[in-house]
Amino acid sequence: MIILDFSQFLPDIGSGFIIGFVIGWAAKKAIKVVAFLIGIYILSLLYLAKIGVISINKEAFSALLGNLENSLLVFGDKIIGLIHSFSFGTSFLIGFGLGFKKG
């Protein structure tokens, strides 16, 4: 009969969860700050365009947003590959999810 001592796995599980929670919480806070700054920037551009100080090339702006979307998708794929390479990936993902939810 094989007796398994689960206490040897606790440091990996616990550290993965804690690291995931902190990174998830920080990621959500960072996303909120970046979204706020982008919103302020876009609003300032729209205001300047409305009063005639600048002119916005709508086609180039749409292309820029499309390129940004593709870049974010590629970055997301790389992050997923990185998470899968962690030995404590499951607890990391659970911690990340909870940290993201709480952040």
Swiss-Prot record:
Record Pfam families: FUN14
Domain of life, source organism: Archaea
Any one GO cellular component localisation term in the record: plasma membrane
Entry keywords, A to Z: Cell membrane, Membrane, Transmembrane, Transmembrane helix
InterPro entries per record: FUN14 (IPR007014)
Membrane-crossing segments per the record: 6-26, 34-54, 79-99
Main location: membrane
Mode of membrane association: Multi-pass membrane protein
Localization of this protein: Cell membrane
Keyword Cell membrane applies: yes
Keyword set includes Cell membrane: yes
Family: Belongs to the FUN14 family.
Record-given protein name: Uncharacterized protein MJ0067
Species name: Methanocaldococcus jannaschii (strain ATCC 43067 / DSM 2661 / JAL-1 / JCM 10045 / NBRC 100440)
